[in-house]
């Protein structure tokens, strides 16, 4: 399974970019033993359209053009579900991998959010809480959760989970 993070906008050099790169590199290294062949990041330039609806539609077209037909898709959106613990994310990723899905695409929208066509294509819509977060931070959180999910699948001690479970 190939992992792909598709994000609207480019992170400038700085701590968010460095931390996102660190989690991506960790995911690549650990993923090899789990059948994960890559963890790529594609940054799509923000639309320059005047109207928000036009910007979101243009960005959606660019996002969907990058999503393989057999891909599982997790869309990061503030209107998504925030009740999935890391173990559930790992379970879903492992299930998609074991079912032969060729790719997992994590989508991070732009400042105006995600178009309904992207939300409709998603297998799951994930929120990192009710607060609105900066896109750089969402990228770090998404990549950290990918890495954490892989550690759970590998039985790695990074994720300690619930000691009562």
UniProtKB/Swiss-Prot annotation:
Record has Ribonucleoprotein as a keyword: no
Main location: cytoplasm
InterPro entries: Alpha/beta_knot_MTases (IPR029028), RlmH-like (IPR003742), tRNA_m1G_MTases_N (IPR029026)
Subcellular location: Cytoplasm
Keywords in alphabetical order: Cytoplasm, Methyltransferase, rRNA processing, S-adenosyl-L-methionine, Transferase
CDD domains for the chain: RlmH-like
Superkingdom in the source lineage: Bacteria
Residues reported to bind S-adenosyl-L-methionine: 109
EC number: 2.1.1.177
Quaternary context: Homodimer.
Family membership noted in the UniProt record: Belongs to the RNA methyltransferase RlmH family.
PANTHER family xref list: METHYLTRANSFERASE, RIBOSOMAL RNA LARGE SUBUNIT METHYLTRANSFERASE H
Protein name per the record: Ribosomal RNA large subunit methyltransferase H
Lineage: Bacteria, Pseudomonadati, Pseudomonadota, Alphaproteobacteria, Hyphomicrobiales
């Amino acid at each position: 399974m190939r992992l792909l993070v598709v994000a609207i906008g480019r992170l400038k050099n700085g701590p968010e970019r460095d931390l996102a790169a660190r989690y991506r590199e960790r995911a690549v290294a650990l993923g090899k033993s789990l059948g994960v062949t890559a963890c790529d990041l594609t940054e799509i330039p923000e639309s320059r359209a005047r109207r928000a609806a036009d910007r979101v539609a243009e960005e959606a077209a660019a996002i969907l053009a990058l999503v393989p037909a057999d891909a599982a898709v997790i869309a990061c959106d503030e209107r998504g579900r925030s009740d999935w613990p890391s173990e559930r994310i790992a379970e879903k990723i492992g299930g998609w991998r074991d079912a032969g899905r060729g790719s997992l695409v994590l989508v991070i929208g732009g400042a105006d959010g995600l178009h309904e066509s992207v939300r409709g294509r998603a297998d799951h819509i994930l929120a990192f809480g009710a607060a609105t977060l900066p896109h750089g931070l969402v990228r770090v959180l998404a990549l950290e959760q990918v890495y954490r999910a892989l550690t759970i699948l590998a039985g790695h001690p990074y994720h300690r989970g619930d000691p009562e479970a």
